[in-house]
Amino acid sequence: MNRFTPSLLQMTRPVSGRLLALLALMLVMFGCQTKDRSAIVTHRVWDEWAVGQVVDARTGLAVPMQPWLEGLATYEVIYLGEEHHNRSHIDAALTVLRSLMSQGRRPWLAMEMFGWDGQPALARYLRSEESVRSEFLEQVLWKQNWGGAFEDYEPLTEFAKDQHLPLLAMNPPKSLIRQVVKQGLVQAKEQPEWRQWGMEGEGIVDAPAYRSRILSQLQDCHGGGSPEDYQSMYEASMVRDEGMAKTLAAAMRPLRVEASSGQGPLLSYTGGGHVQYRLPVPDRVARRVPDGLKQVTVYMATFERERAAELHQAMQEGIADYVWLTPQGAQGPPRRCR
């Protein structure tokens, strides 16, 4: 036994009243600490969420709406990722556009729903005072490229027309994407259409993080396919995202020149899958515009109380910079894969 080890007699000697009081105080203190720690662990930040809020994904806390909207004007590119067929997401985009214009800015709008082959018709429609809707949809190749109800996106298109805002067709033509699906990327690159649409020499970057996430989602949403099927779908996804990034990066060159005159920001409006974790389009744009591009991602999501914890987990994984909690669309909650 060394001198630092108390003897059995010392360890069992009667405890003084003063020591008992000290022990009692320590128990109270530790009890309070345990209670506080438990409160921190069990507090669920998503219990405070509500429809209409914008949540900072880093903190899980809602941000004041008006200052946040005003702050968007400081970015060069704003990515809004929607759930298809949800009118509240169109309304959110209109809110952002109006806020930017109220600050003396002239935002440019880019939409996934229009293909490159429809850009000339889209430009004519925006300039014309006497456009016929049915003729416009035929000329812009709406059915061929998107195919959904134009009514879903008409408010955004008409806003750009009424306010004389530039509107960019963001998506590569559907015919080009079909070639990739049917033939594979290597063979598609050899076709005349690849050169026709300015894709010759374009880097189609196969980033590991992107591959892992997109392939996993394809397999979850399209079960039963062969490895070859998934590879061709994945390659088509890469080409779409790279093509949309090409559109945005090209727009940034004149926007930066004219920024001092109030032009911009560039508002990208796509499905949320092209925004998630910055992997599909934002990272590709940043690679193409490397000079300190300032961009922000906003993921718009139907707020379902029972799925709030799942959404919080996605925020912690970095699904976007901000998540805009919205009502569900007329068709109900979005389809979930598996």
Predicted regions and their residues:
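Bacterial N-terminal signal peptides that target proteins for export
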Residues: 4-20
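Bacterial N-terminal signal peptides
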Residues: 20-30
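N- or domain-start disorder-to-order transition segments that initiate the globular core
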Residues: 33-75
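C-terminal regions of proteins
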Residues: 37-49, 157, 243-267, 272-338
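Acidic/histidine-rich, surface-exposed loop or edge segments in extracytoplasmic proteins
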Residues: 49, 72-81, 135-140, 227-228
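Zymogen propeptides
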Residues: 60-61, 65-101
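Membrane-embedded segments
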Residues: 84-95, 106-110, 116-126
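A substrate-binding/cap region within the structured catalytic cores of diverse enzymes
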Residues: 120-251
